[in-house]
Curated annotation (Swiss-Prot):
Organism: Klebsiella pneumoniae subsp. pneumoniae (strain ATCC 700721 / MGH 78578)
Principal subcellular localization: membrane
Subunit: Heterodimer of ArnE and ArnF.
UniProt entry keywords in alphabetical sequence: Cell inner membrane, Cell membrane, Lipid A biosynthesis, Lipid biosynthesis, Lipid metabolism, Lipopolysaccharide biosynthesis, Membrane, Transmembrane, Transmembrane helix, Transport
Protein name in the entry: Probable 4-amino-4-deoxy-L-arabinose-phosphoundecaprenol flippase subunit ArnF
Family that this chain belongs to: Belongs to the ArnF family.
Gene expressing this chain: arnF
GO terms assigned for molecular function: carbohydrate derivative transmembrane transporter activity
SUPFAM superfamilies per the UniProt record, alphabetical: Multidrug resistance efflux transporter EmrE
Amino acid sequence: MGFFWALLSVGLVSAAQLLLRSAMVALPPLTDIVAFLQHLLHFQPGTFGLFFGLLGYLLSMVCWYFALHRLPLSKAYALLSLSYILVWAAAIWLPGWHEPFYWQSLLGVAIIVAGVLTIFWPVKRR
């Protein structure tokens, strides 16, 4: 059950990152605090992304709490790195994001996957 909570946390935090990124693109900069607050108060584009992104972080923390009660920290923490892969892939493939693909990035993703697999690889006890 710990894997379930950890993976749910990873999914939520990844979605939250994407929502917050879209919100930051749509909302005015914080240097213009009046315009920023007006956008928030009048539910302008980006407002829902900001609110749902923050909600995603909150729900992710709740799931993480449950995951840490059921998994060793060394294994649970390794699963968090899967969020980097999900956000990277979504930023490349989702329409409207226009993030470029680089082979070096794919190599980095492969190294992350190899690291997670190494941590979870069963160890034979002698």
